[in-house]
Regions:
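Residue microenvironments linked to proteolytic maturation
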Residues: 6-24, 59, 75-176, 181, ...
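N-terminal "first-domain core" detector
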Residues: 20-46
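Pocket-edge structural micro-motifs
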Residues: 27-29, 63-65, 88
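Flexible loop/turn segments at secondary-structure boundaries
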Residues: 32-34, 68-70, 121-123
Length: 187
């Protein structure tokens, strides 16, 4: 059985207003040692991404690496000069997707982490760092604590009109509550 490794990367999120539930960031950044002693090399994902494309599929989007908690789908995965840039869409029709979205908007969760199998890796004898030359990417998770501190969600899109409406309703409810005393009756 193949062994899967989990590693996380991070980058701060900024809310956006176009499509609710859509977010982007770096699932992995090249040349950055994570807290497990791994550094992903440029090009490490190329073969895996091509294999996913040839099958017409994408890696899973999970919540905290829990295979029983898929929360959305990856709409864009590409290597650039920085790392593995991803864009995804949370499923806002399911509880877990809504909860993940609220965490992203609040900034309480903004880490990204990859689940992968190392196909080719080289260990630096002096530093002990393992350089990942090629990996099979299995999944990318939203996580609280990424192994790679530079693997973060960069943007979160939300419906400002929707959140503005809820804010106005909340403000109105507070004004009503402040203006009217609450009475409790007993029989």
């Amino acid at each position: 059985m193949a062994e899967m490794t989990l590693a996380a990367v991070a980058r701060a999120l900024e809310p956006r207003i176009d499509q609710p539930g859509v977010f982007s960031g770096y699932a992995s950044q090249f040349g950055v040692a994570d807290n497990q002693g791994d550094k992903v090399e440029r090009g490490a994902f190329a073969a895996s991404l091509e294999a996913w494309r040839s099958r017409g599929r994408r890696p899973a989007m999970l919540w905290q690496h829990d295979a029983s908690e898929p929360i959305g789908l990856w709409t864009k995965l590409e290597e650039d000069s920085t790392g593995l840039r991803v864009e995804g869409r949370l499923l806002l029709s399911i509880r877990a997707g809504v909860e993940a979205y609220e965490h992203l908007k609040a900034g309480t969760v903004d880490g990204l982490s990859i689940g992968y199998q190392a196909v080719e890796a080289r260990r630096d004898r002096r530093s002990g760092i393992r350089r990942l030359v090629q990996v099979n990417l299995w999944e990318i998770s939203l996580v609280t604590f990424p192994a790679n501190q530079d693997a973060r969600v960069a943007t979160v899109k939300s419906d400002e009109a929707e959140s503005g409406a809820w804010r106005r309703i909340d403000d109105a409810m507070r004004r009503i509550a402040a203006a009217r005393p609450l009475y409790f009756f007993r029989d």
